[in-house]
């Protein structure tokens, strides 16, 4: 399987812009149609275990249906949805439902979830502390800058007793302005989610989304707290709205519901074995 590293530099943007005005837009559409007809598909992922999930748990079933799968690596949460909406890729696996729906609404994108997958929750990590009880007055706490994961991080910190939020706040939209109790006057530092694991030496604790924690080699056994994923916070395979009921959408959903996928998730030594299971999985397989 080929992997592509998506790196957007200013020069590349300029080249792409020139290409658009030269008529590359129509060529791209033709290529997209050709890919679909030949069952060549591109699936976008972010740093973490979900590229491995495509390769180890999803690809085999798709290959049996005649697909050729190419994984496209992105470095942030923004590009994969934009690339999906524009037709540059055919699906992505890198975000939960709450983030997907908010990003799609905010950016007027027609992208939809087709199925949830087992997902690693966020963790609270530190290079300096062995317990949250060791937090001192004025310590810095790194949390993701994007609105959805920021709210998710605050909710986790509240669950762990570090802070308290307004009782009537929508937990999916909470901000630092909604913190009503912060006994240790903690200073919240917002960073791109991918940067937090690399910034633990400059803060007391950091809340790292599961995929980035795994990509950084962080050990969840040493985490100071681990998120129990609420409904809507398990990662999903997303496609364009037009593909939800298409052959591609149905085949991607079937791949996740397949025996091959189940075996890859549950086998001894699987990196996905401890991931939170979606509701459909529990209904189908129980606690396996």
Regions found by a protein language model. Give the residues of each.
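Ligand-binding "clamshell"
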Residues: 102-114, 129, 202, 207, ...
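Ligand-binding clefts/hinges and TM-proximal coupling segments of bilobed small-molecule sensing domains
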Residues: 148-173, 253-288
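Short, polar/charged alpha-helical segment
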Residues: 40, 47-70
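A conserved helix-loop-strand patch within extracytoplasmic ligand-binding domains
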Residues: 114-163, 262
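Short helix-initiation/N-cap motifs at beta->coil->alpha
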Residues: 71-82, 169-198
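Beta->alpha turn/N-cap motifs
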Residues: 75-77, 87-101, 118, 192-193, ...
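Short, low-complexity disordered leader/linker segments with a strong preference
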Residues: 1-40, 283-288
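A bilobed periplasmic-binding-protein/Venus flytrap-type ligand-binding module shared by bacterial periplasmic
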Residues: 121-133, 233-246
